[in-house]
């Protein structure tokens, strides 16, 4: 199986293709990307027959920015008979996957696929039973086995394949299902909530998103991102010349500072989180974020980089490389991840965590 399908936001297929071509090439897994505008997915076809599996095993999924999900597939199954779509699909997967842990019957995230998505949900139950009978799926769901993917691109046309549960998105179609909180000041709140789900393992939330932490929200008005921090019982400095939602101020957890986010300097030394969603050139935001991290003004940060109209992948890569270079220059170990989230539009969300290690019997960030 030499093809890898990558799901992405419709309209960002070229960026997704540029990224996978670049990062696969760095690992000497060569091939070419098939791109159809606004399709919501890209097919990366490797030149060597087993390189699809090698790619999804060796390249960390967390290193990808524009892909929501990926899986290796075989040839396209076409003209599935309406009276029996199951048998050809089972036949394609037998000998490819054994005792898979989960089945996902998916489509691309486009308006055209909405009707097809309804079919996929109904089709999943009988297909799962047939795949279990054939030994393709285990008799119970388990996160320790590969995920079986059936990806429909049109009625009666699908790709079949798999991904590794240790190196994929845990979410169906790569999209966390989040509900907009009725009391949140703006829909942007979902960006930060999704970022927490994508970047921070669930079993680390209690430690890294803990009650009583101090946080800073730069460019906070009206408070969509501050809302997520308050919800987790943090104390928040919300920095913006624009007003904050009264509902947030009434909690007593928010201090509103009428200042420019680019000029604000924290006075506390125990700030755990800094978040930032400002409409500004990405290079300017990246420079500010690097300054916060180098100076140790926060332990972790999540921020958005607005994308230009052209060369988006190159621009994001350049900004991330700048931040990495600044950290390296000052001897700071950090983990950097970036992803175009489902709730992002012309932007990507970046997470940087300074790594704390025991040095000479004390906790130290370096």
From Swiss-Prot:
InterPro entries for the chain: RlmM_FDX, RlmM_THUMP-like, RNA_MeTrfase_FtsJ_dom, rRNA_MeTrfase_M, SAM-dependent_MTases_sf
Localization of this protein: Cytoplasm
Top enzyme class: transferase
The EC number(s) this enzyme carries: 2.1.1.186
Superkingdom as given in the UniProt entry: Bacteria
Family membership noted in the UniProt record: Belongs to the class I-like SAM-binding methyltransferase superfamily. RNA methyltransferase RlmE family. RlmM subfamily.
Subunit structure and binding partners: Monomer.
Function of the protein: Catalyzes the 2'-O-methylation at nucleotide C2498 in 23S rRNA.
HAMAP family: 23SrRNA_methyltr_M
UniProt-recorded name of the protein: Ribosomal RNA large subunit methyltransferase M
Organism: Escherichia coli O6:K15:H31 (strain 536 / UPEC)
High-level lineage: Bacteria, Pseudomonadati, Pseudomonadota, Gammaproteobacteria, Enterobacterales
Gene it is expressed from: rlmM
